[in-house]
């Protein structure tokens, strides 16, 4: 079974996610630093690292994004019932 490893940050608004993504992809801000500074998720303290997980362990929109990404890619903002996420895929394993 394929597993992925991802880091994420969680914010309240799409606009905040868009602005953070722009800074991250332009190299102005490291993903882990952004997560530590602004994420509403407790994982922010670890740079947003969620570790490895399989399909069925995360909410569907989040999971769908993770399993369609390439390693080191930063997602567009993803909305879930928790808020707006940016995801950075950090690994894949079989």
List each language-model region with its residue ranges:
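Glycine-centered tight-turn and secondary-structure capping sites
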Residues: 25-32, 72
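Short, well-ordered alpha-helical segments enriched in acidic and aromatic residues
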Residues: 32-40
């Amino acid at each position: 079974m394929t597993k992925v490893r991802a880091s994420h940050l969680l914010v309240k608004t799409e606009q905040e996610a868009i602005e953070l993504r722009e800074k991250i992809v332009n190299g102005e801000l490291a993903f882990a630093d952004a997560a530590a500074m602004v994420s509403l998720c407790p994982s922010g303290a670890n740079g947003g690292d969620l570790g490895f997980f399989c399909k069925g362990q995360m909410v569907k929109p989040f999971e769908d994004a993770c399993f369609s990404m390439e390693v080191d890619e930063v997602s567009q903002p993803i909305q879930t019932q928790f808020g707006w996420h940016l995801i950075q895929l950090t690994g894949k394993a079989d």
